[in-house]
Amino acid sequence: MQNKKRLAEKALEQGNGILRLAPTWVPRSFCRPGKRIKLHPDDYFVLGQRGGIDERWFSSTTWAENGPDTPEDEGLSYVVVDDEGKEKVLLRDVVELLGAEVIGETLWNKYHRWPMFSKFFDNAGPLPHHIHHRDQHANRVGASGKPEMYFFPSQLNNHGGEFPFTFFGLNP
């Protein structure tokens, strides 16, 4: 843990308080990539039966639960320490080790972790039906709720895919 703390402090110092994160690519076996997330065309299906890469996660301290073959660091953002990218440490570890110094007193005192992340979805077709529970329901199984919002910037969507719509279930 001492080496991780040294790397975390070094990254924070080198960036003058800004952490440089490596890209975090996440495959999904139940979706097909729309090929708009600026990944090399040869790399969308590099993980074979685990699925095509159709998500890029940002500032993530959340493990991607993708079944039994999921690597222990899938979905987790790495802080890059050196220019060559050889020295790196998980953002999750940086937050755990440096606490309020890196995420501020308000978030640290309330959550004692980094409680959010962003992602680019890039699906060729519509997402399958799924649900994200609120905290009150997720807490029953020892999990946190997952509030979501969707934004479709035209600069990153040069075409709409096969079905450029999304549906939301609303409880008025």
Region spans (language model):
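Transition-metal
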Residues: M1-P172
